[in-house]
Amino acid sequence: MKRDGGSLLPRERMIKAGPESLSVEELVAIVLRTGKKGKHVLELSKDLLERFDGSLIKLSNAGLEEIASVEGVGMVKAITLKAALELGKRLHRELERIPEKLDSSVKVYRYCQEMVYLEREIVKVICLDTKLNVIGENTLTVGTSDRSLIHPRDVFRTAIRANASGVIVVHNHPSGDPTPSKEDRLITERLKQAGEILGVSLVDHVIVSRRGYFSFREEGEL
Protein backbone atom coordinates (compact mmCIF):
# COMPACT_ATOMS: atom_id res chain seq x y z
CA MET A 1 0.00 0.00 0.00
CA LYS A 2 1.28 3.46 -0.91
CA ARG A 3 0.42 6.90 0.36
CA ASP A 4 -0.18 9.83 -1.98
CA GLY A 5 2.99 10.66 -3.88
CA GLY A 6 4.19 7.06 -3.86
CA SER A 7 5.86 7.13 -0.43
CA LEU A 8 5.66 4.03 1.71
CA LEU A 9 3.21 3.88 4.59
CA PRO A 10 4.70 3.31 8.07
CA ARG A 11 4.04 -0.43 8.19
CA GLU A 12 5.63 -0.99 4.80
CA ARG A 13 8.59 1.20 5.77
CA MET A 14 9.08 -0.83 8.94
CA ILE A 15 9.15 -4.06 6.93
CA LYS A 16 11.70 -2.67 4.48
CA ALA A 17 13.92 -0.56 6.76
CA GLY A 18 13.15 -1.58 10.34
CA PRO A 19 11.48 0.33 13.20
CA GLU A 20 14.51 2.58 13.74
CA SER A 21 13.83 4.26 10.40
CA LEU A 22 10.39 5.52 11.46
CA SER A 23 9.62 8.85 13.07
CA VAL A 24 7.67 9.07 16.33
CA GLU A 25 4.68 10.25 14.31
CA GLU A 26 4.87 7.14 12.11
CA LEU A 27 5.28 4.78 15.06
CA VAL A 28 2.23 6.28 16.77
CA ALA A 29 0.31 5.94 13.49
CA ILE A 30 1.04 2.20 13.46
CA VAL A 31 -0.36 1.87 16.98
CA LEU A 32 -3.46 3.90 16.09
CA ARG A 33 -3.93 1.72 12.97
CA THR A 34 -6.63 3.85 11.33
CA GLY A 35 -7.50 7.49 10.95
CA LYS A 36 -10.97 8.99 10.84
CA LYS A 37 -13.24 9.98 8.00
CA GLY A 38 -11.46 12.63 5.98
CA LYS A 39 -8.22 12.33 7.96
CA HIS A 40 -5.32 9.95 7.28
CA VAL A 41 -3.88 8.08 10.26
CA LEU A 42 -0.61 10.00 9.92
CA GLU A 43 -2.51 13.27 10.25
CA LEU A 44 -4.34 11.92 13.28
CA SER A 45 -1.01 10.88 14.79
CA LYS A 46 0.34 14.39 14.20
CA ASP A 47 -2.73 15.96 15.84
CA LEU A 48 -2.36 13.68 18.86
CA LEU A 49 1.33 14.44 19.35
CA GLU A 50 0.74 18.18 18.95
CA ARG A 51 -1.88 17.98 21.70
CA PHE A 52 0.92 16.92 24.05
CA ASP A 53 3.56 19.31 22.68
CA GLY A 54 5.28 16.52 20.77
CA SER A 55 6.42 14.97 24.06
CA LEU A 56 6.19 11.23 24.63
CA ILE A 57 6.65 11.87 28.34
CA LYS A 58 3.56 14.09 28.46
CA LEU A 59 1.63 11.62 26.33
CA SER A 60 2.66 8.76 28.61
CA ASN A 61 1.60 10.68 31.73
CA ALA A 62 -1.79 11.63 30.26
CA GLY A 63 -4.89 9.77 31.39
CA LEU A 64 -7.00 7.63 29.10
CA GLU A 65 -9.79 10.19 29.00
CA GLU A 66 -7.43 12.99 27.99
CA ILE A 67 -5.95 10.94 25.13
CA ALA A 68 -9.37 9.72 24.02
CA SER A 69 -10.66 13.30 23.90
CA VAL A 70 -8.45 14.10 20.90
CA GLU A 71 -10.81 14.18 17.93
CA GLY A 72 -10.63 10.91 16.02
CA VAL A 73 -8.84 8.94 18.74
CA GLY A 74 -11.51 7.62 21.10
CA MET A 75 -11.19 5.20 23.99
CA VAL A 76 -10.19 2.06 22.06
CA LYS A 77 -7.23 3.76 20.40
CA ALA A 78 -6.31 5.45 23.69
CA ILE A 79 -6.20 2.08 25.49
CA THR A 80 -4.04 0.56 22.75
CA LEU A 81 -1.64 3.50 22.87
CA LYS A 82 -1.38 3.46 26.68
CA ALA A 83 -0.65 -0.28 26.56
CA ALA A 84 2.15 0.28 24.03
CA LEU A 85 3.66 3.07 26.13
CA GLU A 86 3.49 0.92 29.28
CA LEU A 87 5.31 -1.91 27.50
CA GLY A 88 8.03 0.57 26.59
CA LYS A 89 8.35 1.64 30.23
CA ARG A 90 8.61 -1.96 31.41
CA LEU A 91 11.26 -2.77 28.81
CA HIS A 92 13.22 0.26 29.99
CA ARG A 93 13.00 -0.96 33.59
CA GLU A 94 14.28 -4.41 32.62
CA LEU A 95 17.21 -2.95 30.71
CA GLU A 96 18.13 -0.58 33.53
CA ARG A 97 17.95 -3.29 36.17
CA ILE A 98 20.73 -5.45 34.80
CA PRO A 99 22.69 -5.98 36.99
CA GLU A 100 20.58 -5.62 40.12
CA LYS A 101 23.43 -5.10 42.58
CA LEU A 102 22.70 -1.63 43.95
CA ASP A 103 26.07 -0.73 45.43
CA SER A 104 26.04 2.94 44.39
CA SER A 105 23.55 5.79 44.34
CA VAL A 106 24.04 6.15 40.57
CA LYS A 107 22.80 2.59 40.10
CA VAL A 108 19.80 3.32 42.31
CA TYR A 109 19.00 6.38 40.20
CA ARG A 110 19.17 4.33 37.01
CA TYR A 111 17.16 1.51 38.56
CA CYS A 112 14.33 3.91 39.39
CA GLN A 113 14.59 6.01 36.24
CA GLU A 114 10.91 5.63 35.38
CA MET A 115 9.99 7.47 38.58
CA VAL A 116 11.54 10.76 37.45
CA TYR A 117 8.84 11.34 34.83
CA LEU A 118 5.87 10.88 37.14
CA GLU A 119 3.70 13.87 38.00
CA ARG A 120 2.72 12.39 41.37
CA GLU A 121 5.05 11.53 44.20
CA ILE A 122 5.54 7.85 44.96
CA VAL A 123 7.68 5.97 47.46
CA LYS A 124 9.49 2.76 46.58
CA VAL A 125 11.13 0.38 49.05
CA ILE A 126 13.90 -1.76 47.56
CA CYS A 127 14.84 -4.80 49.63
CA LEU A 128 18.45 -6.03 49.57
CA ASP A 129 20.43 -9.04 50.72
CA THR A 130 23.80 -8.78 52.46
CA LYS A 131 25.58 -8.30 49.11
CA LEU A 132 23.23 -5.46 48.07
CA ASN A 133 21.43 -7.57 45.48
CA VAL A 134 17.77 -6.71 44.95
CA ILE A 135 15.49 -9.37 46.41
CA GLY A 136 12.20 -7.48 46.29
CA GLU A 137 10.53 -4.11 46.09
CA ASN A 138 7.23 -2.47 46.87
CA THR A 139 5.55 0.82 46.06
CA LEU A 140 4.10 2.13 49.31
CA THR A 141 2.55 5.49 48.70
CA VAL A 142 1.07 7.43 45.86
CA GLY A 143 1.01 11.00 47.07
CA THR A 144 -0.13 14.35 45.79
CA SER A 145 2.04 16.47 43.53
CA ASP A 146 3.87 18.09 46.44
CA ARG A 147 3.77 15.72 49.42
CA SER A 148 4.35 12.09 50.25
CA LEU A 149 4.21 10.25 53.56
CA ILE A 150 6.68 7.52 54.46
CA HIS A 151 5.94 5.56 57.62
CA PRO A 152 8.72 3.37 59.10
CA ARG A 153 6.16 0.67 59.93
CA ASP A 154 5.27 0.21 56.25
CA VAL A 155 8.87 0.35 55.08
CA PHE A 156 10.12 -2.31 57.46
CA ARG A 157 7.06 -4.52 57.12
CA THR A 158 8.05 -4.84 53.47
CA ALA A 159 11.67 -5.57 54.44
CA ILE A 160 10.79 -8.22 57.02
CA ARG A 161 8.46 -10.01 54.60
CA ALA A 162 11.31 -10.16 52.07
CA ASN A 163 13.77 -11.30 54.76
CA ALA A 164 15.96 -8.37 53.74
CA SER A 165 19.13 -7.33 55.53
CA GLY A 166 18.81 -3.78 54.25
CA VAL A 167 16.53 -1.41 52.37
CA ILE A 168 16.87 1.55 50.06
CA VAL A 169 13.98 4.00 50.14
CA VAL A 170 13.43 6.02 46.98
CA HIS A 171 10.94 8.77 46.30
CA ASN A 172 10.58 11.26 43.48
CA HIS A 173 10.21 15.03 43.41
CA PRO A 174 7.87 15.90 40.52
CA SER A 175 9.09 19.51 40.72
CA GLY A 176 12.37 18.40 39.16
CA ASP A 177 14.47 19.56 42.13
CA PRO A 178 15.91 16.63 44.14
CA THR A 179 16.96 18.82 47.09
CA PRO A 180 15.57 17.25 50.29
CA SER A 181 13.02 19.14 52.34
CA LYS A 182 13.05 19.43 56.13
CA GLU A 183 10.42 16.69 56.20
CA ASP A 184 12.61 14.44 54.01
CA ARG A 185 15.46 14.78 56.49
CA LEU A 186 13.21 14.06 59.47
CA ILE A 187 11.77 10.97 57.79
CA THR A 188 15.26 9.72 56.96
CA GLU A 189 16.31 9.98 60.60
CA ARG A 190 13.18 8.14 61.73
CA LEU A 191 13.80 5.37 59.21
CA LYS A 192 17.42 5.03 60.31
CA GLN A 193 16.43 4.73 63.98
CA ALA A 194 13.68 2.20 63.25
CA GLY A 195 16.05 0.11 61.15
CA GLU A 196 18.62 0.00 63.94
CA ILE A 197 15.99 -1.29 66.36
CA LEU A 198 14.76 -3.95 63.94
CA GLY A 199 18.16 -5.02 62.66
CA VAL A 200 17.45 -3.98 59.07
CA SER A 201 19.79 -1.26 57.88
CA LEU A 202 18.65 1.78 55.94
CA VAL A 203 21.27 1.54 53.18
CA ASP A 204 20.19 4.80 51.56
CA HIS A 205 17.35 7.21 51.01
CA VAL A 206 17.48 8.56 47.47
CA ILE A 207 15.39 11.38 46.02
CA VAL A 208 15.13 11.23 42.22
CA SER A 209 14.01 13.86 39.73
CA ARG A 210 14.41 14.90 36.11
CA ARG A 211 17.41 17.03 37.09
CA GLY A 212 19.29 14.33 38.96
CA TYR A 213 19.21 12.77 42.41
CA PHE A 214 20.10 13.32 46.05
CA SER A 215 21.55 10.46 48.08
CA PHE A 216 21.59 10.82 51.86
CA ARG A 217 24.34 8.18 52.02
CA GLU A 218 26.46 9.89 49.38
CA GLU A 219 26.10 13.26 51.10
CA GLY A 220 27.21 11.82 54.44
CA GLU A 221 23.79 12.19 56.09
CA LEU A 222 23.41 8.47 56.78
UniProtKB/Swiss-Prot annotation:
GO terms for biological process: proteolysis. Pfam families: RadC (PF04002), UPF0758_N (PF20582). Gene3D superfamilies: Cytidine Deaminase, domain 2 (3.40.140.10). One of its GO terms (molecular function) is metal ion binding. The keyword Hydrolase applies. Residues 101-222 form the MPN domain. InterPro entries: MPN, RadC_JAB, RuvA_2-like, UPF0758, UPF0758_CS, UPF0758_N. PROSITE patterns: MPN, UPF0758. Coiled coil: none annotated. Zn(2+) binds at residues 171, 173, 184. A motif (JAMM motif) lies at residues 171-184. The keyword Disulfide bond does not apply. This is UPF0758 protein Tpet_1235. It comes from Thermotoga petrophila (strain ATCC BAA-488 / DSM 13995 / JCM 10881 / RKU-1). The lineage of its organism: Bacteria, Thermotogati, Thermotogota, Thermotogae, Thermotogales.
